[in-house]
C-alpha cells in the first residue's frame, strides 16, 4: 500500500473580499505577535478577507482619536482592527479588541476576552470568530475543533489514531491509538465527549470517551457490524446502524439504561 499526504491549498477566495487592517496590539510584543499572526491566518483561510499588516499601512493609530480614515480609504480598507493585551500574572491574560468601519468612520464593536497564556491559540481563535461574525453576520468556526481518524503504516502494519485538533489543524490530541480500525467518530452536543466504533478487541464496539479525562466506556457490543453512532440533541440517545442478516437497520440506544 502507498500512502501520501493530502494537502488542500486555497489559492482563490471571494471575488470581492473584505479588506481588513490588523494593527499590532498594544502590550507584550511576543504575545501580540502570536495573536496577530493566528487571527490573520484564521481570516485568510476563509477566503473572504484581504489582510493588511503594519508594514502595508500608511499610518498606525494606537487609539480611535489617532485614526485617519483617509489613509485607510486610499488602501481600500473596509475595517480596522486594534487592540491591547494585558497579562497581570503568569496565569491570567486579557485581550481587548475594537473593530472600526472605515465607511462609517466609527467603532462598531468592542470586546474583551479572558484566558490563560498556554491557551493563547484558542483565545486568538475566539477573536477571529468575533471579527468574522461582526463583518459577515455569520458565526465563525475558527474556535471549533476537528475530530478525525488517521492511518499510518509502521513496520508494514496500520496504526489508527482518533485525533482532536483545532480547526486550523494545530493542538492535536490523540484520544486513542489502535492497530485495529476506528470508525464513525461523532461529537456529543456539549463537545465534551465523543462516540466512535473501535475494532480493537476484534469485534465492533461503540465507545463514549471523555475528551478532558480520557476515560471511556463501552455502550454497545454485539456480534453484528455496527457503525455511524450519532447523538440526539439532548445527548441522551445514540442512533446507530446495525447490520444483521445482510440488512442495515437503524436503532436508537438509550444511554441511561443502555437499551
Per-range role (PLM):
Residues 2-4:
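Sec/Tat signal peptide C-region and signal peptidase I cleavage site
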Residues 6, 40, 63-130:
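Amphipathic beta-strand/beta-sheet edge segments enriched in Tyr/Trp
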Residues 9-70, 81-84:
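Short beta-strand->alpha-helix linker/helix-N-cap micro-motif
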Residues 139, 151-161, 177-180, 197-206, ...:
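A flexible loop/linker signature enriched in serine peptidases of the S9 family
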Residues 140-142, 189-190, 233-234:
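Residue-level detector of Asp-centered blade-edge/turn motifs that repeat once per structural unit
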Residues 146, 191-195, 235-239:
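Hydrophobic beta-strand positions that form the internal "hydrophobic ladder"
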Amino acid at each position: 500500500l502507498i500512502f501520501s499526504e493530502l494537502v488542500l491549498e486555497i489559492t482563490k477566495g471571494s471575488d470581492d473580499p473584505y479588506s481588513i487592517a490588523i494593527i499590532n496590539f498594544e502590550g507584550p510584543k511576543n504575545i501580540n505577535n502570536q495573536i496577530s499572526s493566528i487571527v490573520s491566518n484564521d481570516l485568510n483561510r476563509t477566503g473572504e478577507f484581504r489582510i493588511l499588516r503594519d508594514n502595508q499601512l500608511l499610518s498606525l493609530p494606537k487609539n480611535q482619536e489617532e485614526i485617519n480614515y483617509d489613509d485607510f480609504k486610499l488602501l481600500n480598507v473596509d475595517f480596522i482592527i486594534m487592540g491591547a493585551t494585558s497579562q497581570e500574572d503568569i496565569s491570567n491574560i486579557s485581550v481587548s479588541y475594537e473593530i472600526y468601519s472605515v465607511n462609517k468612520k466609527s467603532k462598531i464593536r468592542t470586546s474583551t476576552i479572558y484566558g490563560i497564556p498556554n491557551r493563547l491559540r484558542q483565545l486568538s481563535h475566539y477573536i477571529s470568530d468575533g471579527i468574522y461574525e461582526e463583518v459577515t453576520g455569520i458565526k465563525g468556526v475558527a474556535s471549533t475543533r476537528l475530530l478525525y481518524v488517521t492511518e499510518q503504516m509502521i513496520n508494514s502494519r496500520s496504526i489508527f489514531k482518533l485525533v482532536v485538533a483545532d480547526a486550523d489543524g494545530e493542538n492535536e490530541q490523540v484520544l486513542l491509538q489502535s492497530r485495529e480500525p476506528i470508525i464513525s467518530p461523532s461529537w456529543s452536543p456539549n463537545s465534551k465527549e465523543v462516540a466512535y466504533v473501535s475494532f480493537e478487541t476484534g469485534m465492533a464496539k461503540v465507545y463514549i470517551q471523555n475528551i478532558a479525562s480520557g476515560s471511556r466506556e463501552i455502550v454497545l457490543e454485539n456480534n453484528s457490524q455496527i457503525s455511524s453512532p450519532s447523538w440526539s440533541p439532548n445527548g441522551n440517545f445514540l442512533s446507530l446502524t446495525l447490520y444483521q442478516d445482510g440488512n442495515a437497520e437503524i436503532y436508537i440506544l438509550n444511554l441511561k439504561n443502555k437499551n
